Amino acid sequence: MFRLNTLSALAELAVGSRWYHGASQPTQTKRRLMLVAFLGASAVTASTGLLWKKAHAESPPCVNSKKPDTEDKERNKDSGEVSSREGRAADAAAEPYPEDKKKKRSGFRDRKVMEYENRIRAYSTPDKIFRYFATLKVINEPGETEVFMTPQDFVRSITPNEKQPEHLGLDQYIIKRFDGKKIAQEREKFADEGSIFYSLGECGLISFSDYIFLTTVLSTPQRNFEIAFKMFDLNGDGEVDMEEFEQVQSIIRSQTSMGMRHRDRPTTGNTLKSGLCSALTTYFFGADLKGKLTIKNFLEFQRKLQHDVLKLEFERHDPVDGRISERQFGGMLLAYSGVQSKKLTAMQRQLKKHFKDGKGLTFQEVENFFTFLKNINDVDTALSFYHMAGASLDKVTMQQVARTVAKVELSDHVCDVVFALFDCDGNGELSNKEFVSIMKQRLMRGLEKPKDMGFTRLMQAMWKCAQETAWDFALPK
């Protein structure tokens, strides 16, 4: 019986095979299309798997594992506990960075958390970045709440490998109750009176709209603002009113990675308000808002902002007698480099070897070098001229380029530190290509990079390629 069933099944298979190959044999074009579809589907599946593995292979333990429950949150509103939590957060943010602390922070959990935070900085939307790194939720007299960043939070949000204080993460804040008088009394607590952050109002705190505006100013070259101002300066007097400046701001923001990724989220309260905050409009256009803003005044605002952010970065390293170590300065230069960890460690070791008992660098020396970096494109051109002329790119050449291009004097000690980092073969000459590429990234603080993993662009390229290939197969020449 089993043999008869097997024979009948084989007979039916033979009949089906003859029918398929005889009556429904696909054409050559259909075979090609089927092959293209199969290859395209395989490529999409493989690419998706690789990107997913890359994004989540090093996923850290949940940073919100110690998130307080509802009762804890209610108790945190008590002023005594708020002040104690605030003190702990301030201590964590202001702790010095000696060598023993670096060893303490190099634990497995801390490394994974910092990697996770770096991915937030690189790939998340502005809304999530702001909610993660902001540390204050202010409750005003009517009972309305708003989330704010301190200037230190702002610098931390754009600086890789700067760990968020413990128990402060996504939607985890220090709650403060302020009335108008208390804000005025504690204004100096978050920003010095001479700081540009003091102009933001709200005791130097940074709202979400301010955060987008400040990152736009930091990530946009000076030349772009000059061109945008000239576009909207219809009468050619070099001035724009408030309405025209809002148009300039909107256009510039749409060209930045932050602006392109932003979507208003009413559920979290992080919506981009039209115009500037009241303190900035008064700063730019006067109390009656009828003044005019010149490109010179705006570029001065940009320069002050860059100066204050650099000053905060400098102070985070806990300078001793107004000086930071050579290794800390090297860390500032390489913070946004994207250099592989092994090479980065080797460069830091080389720096430590050269300056075991170094005298350190003052803020003025650091600021002069970063003024030199603001003209990095012109510096690149000048160094290329030296290279094509056959001249060696030594320390004297760098100082000459700084005087010619940026009108600043670089000290011999600063040049020694830079050459210790970028003199790969130890012959006293600069590796100018790597130096220029890393310094361009440092100047823009990584804010010019697209805030995505490239998956969308990959899928668009694959779809376009599949369409063109299928068309070529369907209509062969």
Curated annotation (Swiss-Prot):
Residues 1-33 form a transit peptide. One of its GO terms (molecular function) is calcium channel inhibitor activity. Residues 457-467 are annotated as: C-helix region. GO terms for biological process: calcium import into the mitochondrion; calcium ion import; cellular response to calcium ion; cellular response to calcium ion starvation; mitochondrial calcium ion homeostasis; mitochondrial calcium ion transmembrane transport; positive regulation of cristae formation; positive regulation of mitochondrial calcium ion concentration. Ca(2+) 2 binds at residues 423, 425, 427, 429, 434. Its main location: mitochondrion. Residues 57-107 are annotated as: Disordered. Residues 101-112 are annotated as: Polybasic region. Residues 220-255, 356-376, 410-445 form the EF-hand domain. Pfam families: EF-hand_5, EF-hand_8. Changing residue 124 to D: Mimics phosphorylation; leading to decreased stability. Belongs to the MICU1 family. MICU1 subfamily. This is Calcium uptake protein 1, mitochondrial. It comes from Mus musculus (Mouse). The gene is Micu1.
